Each structure stands twice: as structure tokens, then as C-alpha cells.
Curated annotation (Swiss-Prot):
Native organism: Marinomonas sp. (strain MWYL1)
The protein's name in its UniProt record: Threonylcarbamoyl-AMP synthase
UniProt GO cellular component terms: cytoplasm
The keyword DNA damage belongs to this UniProt entry's keyword annotation: no
EC number: 2.7.7.87
Broad enzyme group: transferase
Upper taxonomic lineage: Bacteria, Pseudomonadati, Pseudomonadota, Gammaproteobacteria, Oceanospirillales
Length: 185
């Protein structure tokens, strides 16, 4: 198990096309550069997840979301960047910014502004958004520890971020940015 504490080292791994595991607000996630097709496909293969479902992107700061914020009216943009008690991923219309291998069969993408410090530090070091999908093969419960990540994926990921999980009891809810409709509680 390759535990890493340096966000700069993790960001370099991501830039080089690597796949990492990292603690999110509630569960462990797998992450990579969303614009690196081979890295995204590697995550999809590790999880046995169909590309058609799409993946969530996570940011640690508002500036990292500016390409998507520019597509939204003021009310929707404010909804995306507002602080939520519950981690929330917002489904945003998108056909031009996010690659199809991240969007799946959708004309939209789910993005989240994380309030979890390890995620914020990681995205800042990477200088952008990263993929955020639960660290588990399809049909199994998400990993709740670095040890569980290792049990699921062994040496098939490049690093595990040695940092604490957040305090949320559930993975992020997923809502439509335009209607506020709930897709996943």
C-alpha cells in the first residue's frame, strides 16, 4: 500500500495519468485528471462501472469551477458555490467543457465544491478539478478506510492519500442545478 501525505506528490501522480484514492466528506474516493481519458477509463475498469453513467468532478475552490460557473445564470451559480450542510454534487448542463468519457450519456456533468480540507488541498496542488467516484467495485460498499481501499484495489492504484475522512454520514447528494430537484439523497 503506497500511502502518501504530500499533496504535491499526489498532484504529480495525477498529472502523469495516475489514479489515486483519497478521503472525501463521507467515503473514500478514486480520483484522476478528468481530461486524461486513459486515467478515467482505468477508474471505470477498476470499478466495473459503465461509462454511460458518468462521473462526478470535485473542486476545492470556487476558481476551479469557473468554466462551469460561466455557463450558469447568477442564481444557479450562487447555488453551486453556496455552503451546504450536506455535501452536494450539482448536475450542470455541459456539452463543451467536460469530455464525454466523464459525462457518460449525459449532456451534463455533476460537480461538487468540497468543504473537506484534504480535498481542497489536493485540488489546489493539482490546480483544478479531479474525478470523484466512490472507492469500491460495483455492487460493494464504498471503502471507509485506506485499508479497505487496498483490499479492493491492491496495487492497481498509484497512491492512497494518507488523510482523514470527513464527518458526513452519507456520500454527497446529487441535485439538478437549474431545478434543485434531488437525484440521489
Amino acid at each position: 500500500m503506497h500511502l502518501v501525505t504530500s499533496v504535491e506528490e499526489l498532484a504529480d501522480i495525477i498529472r502523469q495519468g495516475g489514479v489515486i484514492a483519497y478521503p472525501t466528506e463521507a467515503v473514500w474516493g478514486l480520483g484522476c485528471d478528468p481530461f486524461n481519458e486513459s486515467a478515467v477509463r482505468r477508474i471505470l475498469t477498476l470499478k466495473s462501472r459503465p461509462e454511460s453513467k458518468g462521473l462526478i468532478l470535485v473542486a476545492g475552490a470556487q476558481e476551479e469551477l469557473s468554466p462551469w460557473l460561466n455557463l450558469l445564470d447568477d442564481k444557479a451559480a450562487q447555488r453551486l458555490i453556496s455552503l451546504n450542510e450536506t455535501p452536494t454534487s450539482w448536475v450542470v448542463p455541459d456539452t463543451t467543457i467536460t469530455p464525454s468519457w466523464v459525462r457518460g450519456e449525459h449532456q451534463s456533468v455533476a460537480i461538487r465544491l468540497s468543504q473537506h480540507q484534504p480535498v481542497q488541498r489536493l485540488c489546489a496542488a493539482f490546480q483544478g478539478v479531479i474525478v470523484s467516484t466512490s472507492a469500491n467495485p460495483a455492487g460493494l460498499e464504498p471503502a471507509m478506510s485506506a485499508k479497505e481501499v487496498h483490499q479492493y484495489f491492491g496495487c492497481n492504484i498509484d497512491a492512497i492519500f494518507d488523510a482523514p475522512l470527513g464527518d458526513a454520514s452519507q456520500p454527497s447528494q446529487v441535485r439538478d442545478i437549474l431545478t434543485d430537484n434531488l437525484f440521489r439523497a
